[in-house]
Regions:
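Membrane translocator/pore-forming domains, dominated by Gram-negative outer-membrane beta-barrels
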Residues: 1, 7, 51-52, 91, ...
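Outer-membrane translocation/initiation segment of Type V secreted surface proteins
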Residues: 5-188, 254
Length: 341
């Protein structure tokens, strides 16, 4: 039995396999000393497998040429000559169990982390698309200026993403965001303002793929028009500086630009109840980095918000609300490029 240690130095791998050992036969067996009995080469994981008389690194069953079946032999009638058996104990031979090759290639730790972090970046930017009600509340008190703060903590779960021949592990992330801003009334119906924000997403890749982080520092401007009949239009432009890294990737920096527009109308009901249908459309662009294409997406949301106002004895107003939203996010085919993929 023999042990092989493999170091990835960027050599090209053709057709999903590379031959490590060539033999003319024999019963020699080989196994890897690498952790988990596998090697990450470019986008995929590779395992040691026997192909005929040779031993190869392969990323799936389809990459290995199957051994042709042995033609059947017609047995002859045996001639048995009884003899006294001689029992000679043999030293047991322990053959290491070869790993079972996957049916389709599995993403390498590096590829899974980079693709998943790219998703996490877009999620974090879109998660901070604050609607007018989240940012300003029910602005109908006629005040000339407002200062506001918004803290959001959420947990998101993404299923596996198809990447062509393979798929990601999927991931969960905990998002913590803080935004602080101020605005002033230009007219009775128009308000202009700005804000700064800081966010972090702690990303947990499913399976044995480890963890990652995405951080964001952002600054933005907005203009909100609120008509007397309850119709409002809210426009936001925002710049974000993103930082992403994981257990297996170095820290990378990105620039993200977002334009968002929201339209809605508030209907006043009895006893300080209000109902507000609303729609939002946003565009986001995240810059490229080394082997990563730039990423652009269109985010759309339609929703309904129901609120109830309470006037407190100290002059404060309390307004709990509930909202339901349908959200879609469409992006073009942004790619991450690897050798051997």
């Amino acid at each position: 039995n023999h042990k092989i240690g493999v170091t990835n130095q960027g050599a090209n791998v053709a057709n999903g396999k590379v031959t490590l050992v060539e033999t003319n036969g024999g019963n020699a067996a080989f196994s890897l000393t690498n952790p988990n009995n596998r090697v990450d080469l470019g986008a995929y994981q590779y395992f040691l497998a026997k192909e005929g008389n040779n031993w190869v690194l392969a990323n799936s069953k389809n990459a290995v040429t199957p051994t042709p079946p042995v033609a059947p032999v017609t047995p002859n009638k045996p001639v048995v000559t009884p003899s006294k058996p001689v029992v000679t104990p043999n030293k047991p031979v322990v053959t290491p169990t070869a790993p079972v090759l996957p049916s389709t290639p599995l993403l390498s730790d590096l590829a899974n982390a980079q693709v998943s972090l790219r998703q996490a970046q877009l999620l974090l930017v879109e998660d901070n698309l604050s609607g007018i009600h989240q940012r300003l509340g029910e602005v109908k008190n006629g005040e000339k200026g407002n200062v506001w703060a918004r803290n959001v903590n959420s947990r998101q779960k993404l299923a596996a993403l198809s990447t062509g021949e393979s798929e990601t592990s999927g991931f969960k992330q905990n998002v913590h965001s803080l935004q602080v801003g101020a605005d002033a009334a230009v007219t009775d119906n128009l308000r202009l303002g700005g804000f700064v924000g800081r966010s972090q997403a702690n990303v947990d890749f499913n399976g044995d793929y480890g963890d990652g982080k995405v951080r964001s520092n952002s600054v933005g401007l907005y203009a909100a028009y609120l008509a007397d009949n309850g119709i409002y239009v809210d426009n936001i432009v925002k710049y974000s500086r993103l930082h992403a890294n994981s257990d297996l990737t170095e820290k990378r920096h990105y620039n993200a630009y977002t334009i968002s527009s929201e339209l809605g109308k508030r209907f006043n009901l009895v006893n300080d109840w209000t109902i507000t249908p609303q729609a939002q459309l946003a565009w986001t662009h995240i810059s490229s980095q080394e082997n990563e294409d730039s990423l652009s997406s269109v985010y759309s949301r339609i929703g309904l918000r129901v609120a109830k106002g309470f006037a407190l004895s100290n002059g404060w107003n309390l307004q709990p609300y509930a909202a339901v939203n349908a959200i879609t996010s469409k992006n073009r085919s942004s790619k991450i490029h690897y050798a051997n993929s």
